[in-house]
Amino acid sequence: MIPKKAFVVKGTGVHKDKLASFELALRDAGIEKFNLVTVSSILPPNCSIVSRKEGLEELAPGQIVYCVMAKNQTNEPERMIAAAIGNAVPVDSNDYGYISEHHSFGEDERTAGIYAEDLAATMLATTLGIEFDADSAWGERERVYKASGHIFDTVHYCRCVKGDENGLWTTVVVSMVFVL
């Protein structure tokens, strides 16, 4: 049971009830009609990243669907929340990659997204035995990772919003959804 395809979705939901807010975020992302099972952070070998449209066309309502999901929620007015996933893909498509989840408060979209991307790349780099200075800035580590010849690409996806001004529950989700 190894996924051959994956796609990314993002959503936001606002409601007086926390669970309903999450449901609305899933609807906004287009994945509310599936039975979602969250899994850990491995991008399978030979797994193609496809468009949301292409991925959704291969799934049926009620289907059990595996995903890596970043989620954050608040009912504090104007509180900044972010959910992000980072993706690190190795040069050799027969090797596995990493997907990281990051959930934060007070970070803007760029900061949260870069953190998630850095985390995925660092996890992949450590499994490949790439030597690097863990205290160096992300840009420097990114150059080292890519210069090693092992890491082909890194990317991040993020949803960042301020909590509802009236204190309604606000939820953000970002998910890498797998197609078997």
From Swiss-Prot:
Protein name according to UniProt: Pyruvoyl-dependent arginine decarboxylase
GO molecular function: arginine decarboxylase activity
Domain of life of the source: Archaea
Site, Cleavage (non-hydrolytic): residue positions: 40-41
HAMAP family to which the protein is assigned, alphabetical: PvlArgDC
Family: Belongs to the PdaD family.
Sorted UniProt keywords: Decarboxylase, Lyase, Pyruvate
InterPro entries recorded: Pyr-dep_his/arg-deCO2ase, Pyr-dep_his/arg-deCO2ase_sand, Pyruvoyl-dep_arg_deCO2ase
Pfam families: PvlArgDC
Pyruvic acid (Ser): residues bearing it: 41
Cofactors: pyruvate
Swiss-Prot/TrEMBL catalytic activity: L-arginine + H(+) = agmatine + CO2
Membrane spanning stretches: none
EC numbers on record: 4.1.1.19
Annotated source species: Methanococcoides burtonii (strain DSM 6242 / NBRC 107633 / OCM 468 / ACE-M)
GO BP, one annotated term: arginine catabolic process
Cofactor info, note text: Binds 1 pyruvoyl group covalently per subunit.
